[in-house]
Design a protein with these regions (language model features):
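Membrane-embedded glycan-lipid processing machinery
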Residues: 21, 56, 60, 71, ...
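Short hydrophobic/aromatic helix or loop-helix immediately within or flanking a transmembrane segment
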Residues: 35-45, 55-77, 311
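Membrane-interface anchor segments at the N-terminal boundary of transmembrane helices
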Residues: 80-81, 287-288, 294-366
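Membrane-interface transmembrane helices that cradle and orient dolichyl/undecaprenyl
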Residues: 107, 143-159, 169, 187-192
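Transmembrane-helix signature of polytopic, membrane-embedded enzymes
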Residues: 3-9, 97-119, 137-138, 152-158, ...
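Short helix- or helix-capping micro-motifs
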Residues: 13-16, 110-121, 125, 138, ...
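Transmembrane-helix motifs of polytopic, lipid-linked glycan transferases
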Residues: 84-105, 142, 146, 349, ...
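Membrane-proximal stem/loop segments at transmembrane-domain junctions that anchor or position
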Residues: 224-314
Length: 415
């Protein structure tokens, strides 16, 4: 195998992102940060994985914070370090898409699909800003590639690698909690060894998650992946539908009366006043989880409306635009209004046509994964950023459709 396709894919992924990085360099660490950035800074200054020194937190999905910590430690908190390293991750993602297509379809389909997937206008902008989906993309492709390899080669050590990869994906996005079961369902068969491989996958995933869960019990007070069930409540309460329908996001849902501070708010308060606000994360986790279950039980009709709304927001070809966002009214909005819909509509149409041209196991796995993302969105919330890490599956199908049409035309011209 020559290196030329790898170089092409790497260049296509890197060049536009480098251009965006240079244009956006002043905003990388100011206008578009998230709570993982705060946690990384506190950890490096005090050794506490939290928002307030000496007060550990589980109020987040921890993977992205752990990704930022070594970057800040080695290179300081600099826009170029975050941007360049995240571009490297995006390049790695594109190369994995190429490898997936090359192995399961053809080299040319893999090459074009990797280029199509990495040129998603939404990703080109977001990949250089601080957002945890940069890791979701890489891990998503790795999971699909490893699962497809294991489906044809029953390797226990590869099963362990897949298990750890799934655990990392869950630590980055708890919406993927049940993904290991889906992967194992595609691995098991009549042969006894397939069940052994599936067992290794589940064991590897569980063992990789245990340290974080135990840490939360010791440091925070409860066995959990994250205590932030308030995010689930924001997506499941009587005010959610109207808030989202008004063009806002779940963060704009009105808080409860006399609501106690969140760990994130406590961190911001500590920065300004130097005082520690008491926060019982485990009690809050149980409280908001109870409210969510109560809402589902008492308002099934409202929940059905929210599920439909979330599905549309997940699959809307036009990237979700919420009021009050930092980039409102600028060039990013122009991309959302014109470039993103043009890209997404073409991708979706060709993907539907091309799914029948992919190898059966890959096509079925891809459809199931996208259906899983839709079901999770119906339970939580839907947004473009939750879907795009998996758009490479659609890009593979779309490219297969294009090449099928090209080959058919060539055969007709020869005949």
């Amino acid at each position: 195998m020559t290196r030329r396709p790898w170089l092409i894919v790497a260049a296509v992924a890197a060049v536009p992102r480098l251009a965006v990085l240079l244009v956006e360099r002043r905003d990388i660490l100011t206008a578009f940060t998230e709570k993982s950035d705060d946690i990384a800074q506190v950890f490096l200054k005090t050794g506490t994985f939290g928002f307030v020194p000496g007060h550990p937190t589980a109020w987040t999905q921890p993977l992205y914070a752990w990704f930022l910590i070594p970057i800040y430690w080695i290179f300081d908190r600099s826009w170029w370090a975050v941007g360049v390293i995240q571009i490297a991750v995006a390049v790695g993602t594109a190369l994995l898409v190429y490898e997936l297509g090359r192995r399961l379809v053809s080299q040319r389909v893999g090459l074009v699909a990797a280029c199509v997937a990495t040129l998603n206008p939404y990703l080109i902008w977001h990949d250089v800003h601080e957002n945890r989906e940069i890791l979701d993309q890489f891990l998503a492709v790795a999971i699909v590639l490893l699962t497809m390899i294991l489906a044809g080669r029953r390797s226990l050590w590869l099963g362990a690698v897949l298990g750890v990869t799934l655990a990392l994906a869950i630590l980055g996005n708890t919406r993927l909690l049940f993904l290991p079961l889906i992967c194992c369902a595609f691995l098991v068969g009549r042969e006894q060894r397939t069940w052994a491989v599936a067992g290794v996958v589940l064991a590897g995933c569980a063992l990789a998650l245990v340290p974080w869960v135990v840490r939360n019990k010791v440091s925070v007070g409860c066995f959990t992946l994250t205590t932030d069930t308030r995010a689930l409540w924001k997506a499941n309460n009587p005010n959610t539908y109207a808030t989202l329908a008004a063009g806002k996001w779940i963060d704009d849902v009105p808080p409860l009366p006399n609501e106690p501070p969140t760990p994130e708010f406590a961190g911001a308060y500590y920065k300004v006043y130097g005082k520690v606000l008491p926060v019982d994360e485990c009690a809050r986790m149980r409280f908001y989880r109870h409210l969510v279950f109560q809402f589902w039980r008492d308002h099934p009709g409202e929940k059905a409306k929210l599920a439909g709304q979330a599905s549309w927001m997940l699959w809307d070809p036009q990237a979700i635009r919420t009021e009050g966002r930092a980039e409102s009214g600028g060039a990013v909005d122009v991309l959302r209004e014109w470039a993103q819909p043009a890209y997404s509509i073409a991708l979706f149409v060709l993907g539907i046509l091309g799914v029948w041209l992919l190898p059966g196991r890959l096509a079925l796995f891809g459809v199931v994964l996208l259906a899983y993302q839709t079901l999770v969105a119906m339970g939580f919330a839907g947004a473009t950023r939750y879907r795009v890490p998996w758009d490479f599956l659609i890009a593979l199908a779309a490219t297969a459709a294009v090449w099928w049409a090209i080959d058919r035309r060539r055969r007709r011209s020869v005949a």
